[in-house]
Amino acid sequence: MTTATSSNISSKLPSIRGEIEANAPLAPLTWFRVGGNAEWLVSPYDTEDLSDFLKKIDPSMPVRVLGIGSNVIIRDGGVSGVIIRLPRRFSWVKREEGNRLRCGGSTLGMMISKVAAAESLTNLEFMRGIPGSIGGMIRMNAGAYGGDISKILIQVTLVRRNGDIEIWPVEKLNFAYRYSELPEDAIVTEALFQGQPGDKDKIEAQMNKIIAEREASQPVRSRTGGSTFKNPEGYKAWELIDEAGCRGLKIGDAEVSTKHANFLLNLGDATAADIENLGEEVRARVKAKFGITLEWEIKRIGHKLDGDKA
């Protein structure tokens, strides 16, 4: 345990074998590098530790999960309650019979695709182009380059808010475009994926193509949260944003990327409010021009500061 004293923690939260930090800065844990602190940041030792913690914690205590922070805005006022962040101990991949890969809940899609290539397993190449850990990828049915999670997932192990450990088959998640019925209180600790035998050289060539295309078309080396808005049915969000005159639009140090209009950037000193306000301005302009309401793909969590517009 760090930051808070043991007595202070024990009066508020049950003990764990992992780590608990009070008033923990969250900005360094997100790709935008903005936002306030978590009241409590909890890193469980393993699935059983997480389950035991959730069984003992006050049911009224708010609990949320944070992955690698690639598709989220933490608001400037911080987050009340507990933020669960699975540590590196949950990042692993192993091959199982039947051309399957099992991985831990904090494993990056990039890592899974690399292991799949090393094992000459195909159909997982698209993960190479998606920033994020597996829990968030499952929740939003992440996809790119012709693939998505729903096409390869077999089952998922999750821990519920009451501490129950459950295994859900893919059918129970009722996947749709950028959507799943994974419960809001669920924390993914393991996932099992189905690969297919393939040619290692072809798999690696496809992954290299994905990397090159992503580098050429997206601001991957900037402080960004990935795709900001979902594509409305029949449209591409970036085209609507571009045609509404939003490419390069700025609020404070937040900017609509000139490289890909569906990406928002922190140019250096943006606040979470700057970024969220910019996103809302984009939504307003697209609505005014096309009558289409863009739906946020990026999650926004936490409290706004007094006076914030967003």
Swiss-Prot record:
Reactions catalysed: UDP-N-acetyl-alpha-D-muramate + NADP(+) = UDP-N-acetyl-3-O-(1-carboxyvinyl)-alpha-D-glucosamine + NADPH + H(+)
Example GO biological process: cell division
Keyword DNA repair among UniProt keywords: no
Classification via InterPro entries: FAD-bd_PCMH, FAD-bd_PCMH-like_sf, FAD-bd_PCMH_sub1, FAD-bd_PCMH_sub2, MurB, MurB_C, MurB_C_sf, Oxid_FAD_bind_N
Record's keyword terms, sorted: Cell cycle, Cell division, Cell shape, Cell wall biogenesis/degradation, Cytoplasm, FAD, Flavoprotein, NADP, Oxidoreductase, Peptidoglycan synthesis
GO CC annotations on file: cytosol
Localization (cell): Cytoplasm
EC number annotated for this UniProt entry: 1.3.1.98
Pathway noted in the entry: Cell wall biogenesis; peptidoglycan biosynthesis
Residue intervals of the FAD-binding PCMH-type domain: 33-198
Main location: cytoplasm
Family: Belongs to the MurB family.
Family matches, as HAMAP family: MurB
Role, per record: Cell wall formation.
Protein's name according to its UniProt entry: UDP-N-acetylenolpyruvoylglucosamine reductase
Gene for this chain: murB
